[in-house]
Amino acid sequence: IKVPIYLMTGFLESGKTSFLNFTIQQDYFHTDGKTLLILCEEGEEEYDPAILEANNTVVEIVENEEDFTTDRLVAMDILHQPERVIIEYNGMWLVSNFEKMQLPKGWGVEQQITCVDGSTFQMYMANMKSIFMDMIKNTDMVIFNRCKQDDPLPTYRRGIKVANQRAEVIFEDEEGELDDIFQDEMPFDMDAPVIEILPEDYGIWFVDAMDHPENYDGKTVRFKARVMKPRGMGSKFFV
């Protein structure tokens, strides 16, 4: 990939612009070359032209999906010759349509990040589940913002992991990232006759089992693992 694409997805007012406004100004995201920011929808929050100019970022706006074409992207590439591209994708456009597109030569998706408004997540899941699932099936990271501690966050996480096991899931409230959200509620049933540990929950279970072994005393736990049998070990033993 010569020109990396950072694809931002999420429904309108999910926090995409806020996230990008913050990220563009960070030292770790700085680059000497030009950044092309393609906006496919406009929410309430806008970009500060001074910040964009200071970070060598140019903006192209594509309002209609039928105008979001390979030819249009090639024209942008020729005009701006960007070192990287950020796409703030329209939440009502299927991400799978973008994935099928032929991109300009040298362009390729480096990372996809999906923003979710925690306060409206359940409503969108009830009314636009197919669009949301299409949005997250190949994303690298899902950021839930505007969360509250009493929201069913483990349930939200499981819903994401069912659709995309490799996605990193982050929860934030107004103060920043939430820590230890599984401290009081594990993402598996502790009262089940057999506690089923999904592969994506293994890390959470392992840490909890090391910290609180008494919680699992006398219980049956099922998880996927690899059995190793070193040489010299007795027939009744394995690692």
Provide a role label for each language-model segment:
Residues 84-171:
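Phosphate/Mg2+-binding loops and adjacent switch elements
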Residues 1-111, 115-122:
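Nucleotide-state-sensitive switch-loop elements of NTP-binding domains
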